[in-house]
Amino acid sequence: MSITHAVKHKGYYYAPDPSSQLACSIGGNVAENSGGVHSLKYGTTTNNILGVEMVMMDGTICKLGGKTLDQEGYDLLGLICGSEGLLGVITEVTVKILKNPQTVKAALIGFPTIEDGGNCVTDINSNGIVPAGMEIMLSLIHI
């Protein structure tokens, strides 16, 4: 959320939106390969980082990736992303930011059953529509 806040005035945003975004750090997101409701369209953290600097367990400072998506060699960023801090401590991250969409629309749709809601999600995806986000909310609280 801080990344999006820092670039929104220039018309950009950072796509991953983990549910912990109000309290998490980008290093923690890399360590956990965090995702969120936008993961279907934009991927998780591993799909939205270009490079990292990290301190390895022996104290060595290591830089992986760069400023472009296409890097030669093995995908070491993919190895680090989701490693839960076991391979080192992330100290710097280069992220991919996206241009804000021209329009944003939201819809809230009710369904008689969870199965009907799930079928709607399946129908949307199977027809080639990839929304920026979809969530199913259960009515567990009745007033």
Give the location of each predicted region.
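FAD-binding subdomain of flavoenzyme oxidoreductases
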Residues: 1-135
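Acidic, glycine-rich loop-and-beta core segments that form the ion-binding/anion-interacting portion
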Residues: 138
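Conserved small/polar residues in nucleotide/adenosyl-binding loops
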Residues: 141-143
